[in-house]
Curated annotation (Swiss-Prot):
GO terms for cellular component: cytoplasm; Holliday junction helicase complex; Holliday junction resolvase complex. This is Holliday junction branch migration complex subunit RuvA. CDD domains: UBA_RuvA_C. Residues 65-139 are annotated as: Domain II. Residues 139-143 are annotated as: Flexible linker. InterPro entries: DNA_helicase_Holl-junc_RuvA_I (IPR013849), Hlx-hairpin-Hlx_DNA-bd_motif (IPR003583), NA-bd_OB-fold (IPR012340), RuvA (IPR000085), RuvA_2-like (IPR010994), RuvA_C (IPR011114), RuvA_C_sf (IPR036267). Keywords: Cytoplasm, DNA damage, DNA recombination, DNA repair, DNA-binding. It comes from the Bacteria. The RuvA-RuvB-RuvC complex processes Holliday junction (HJ) DNA during genetic recombination and DNA repair, while the RuvA-RuvB complex plays an important role in the rescue of blocked DNA replication forks via replication fork reversal (RFR). RuvA specifically binds to HJ cruciform DNA, conferring on it an open structure. The RuvB hexamer acts as an ATP-dependent pump, pulling dsDNA into and through the RuvAB complex. HJ branch migration allows RuvC to scan DNA until it finds its consensus sequence, where it cleaves and resolves the cruciform DNA. Residues 1-64 are annotated as: Domain I.
Length: 192
């Protein structure tokens, strides 16, 4: 029904945003991966959307990239995975990380996502096997080389940097850098 929205970003309140399209405000739920990459309030934004109509609600879900939306649509087709759970999965893992977990059949990565238990994780791995390509990983952002780099990336995102900026800063760090020193170096690089 609604495939895309282009308008001004009026409000941001995780996980929801308000997009002003020609004087009409659309409330859109977005995964945190998209939320952290949104422009500043008042700037133009385009979101690919998926509209869910239920007996008690009509909810619009938005995504910055087509792979995110397609993955969301794959997830909600799986028994026991509704739109909120799918949004939670895409907030906890990038599409690339999810693809890598599916390829490696790594349920432990999926159970780290809030709301995903062992049985649901195993069902996801079974249902998505062969459907979600591992080749998506590098195209969507890939996986940090180490746990320290993953922690640095999370810290930078928590400080308000976009995922893209944070990934570029982490990529420029020496491989064996610790979390504390890595954050300091990344912040210096981002300040330039």
């Amino acid at each position: 029904m609604l495939g895309r929205l282009t308008g001004l970003l009026a409000e941001k309140s995780p996980p929801q945003v308000l997009i002003d399209v020609g004087g009409v405000g659309y409330e859109v739920d977005v995964p945190m991966s998209s939320f952290f990459n949104l422009p500043a309030i008042g700037e133009k934004v385009t979101l690919l959307t998926h509209f869910v109509v239920r007996e008690d609600a009509q909810v619009l879900f938005g995504f910055l990239t087509a792979p995110e939306r397609e993955t969301f649509r794959m997830l909600i087709k799986i028994s026991g995975v509704g739109p909120r759970t799918a949004l939670s999965i895409l907030s906890g893992l990038t599409v690339g990380d999810l693809a890598q977990a599916v390829t490696a059949q790594d349920a432990s990565r999926l159970v780290k996502v809030p709301g995903i238990g062992k049985k649901t994780a195993e069902r996801l791995l079974l249902e998505l096997k062969g459907k979600l390509g591992a080749d998506l990983g590098p195209a969507i952002g890939g996986k940090p080389a180490s746990d320290a780099q993953a922690d640095i990336l999370q810290a930078l995102i928590a400080l308000g940097y976009s995922e893209r900026e944070a990934q570029a800063a982490v990529k420029a760090l020496p491989a064996e850098v610790g979390v504390s020193d890595g954050i300091k170096l990344a912040l210096k690089a981002l300040a330039r």
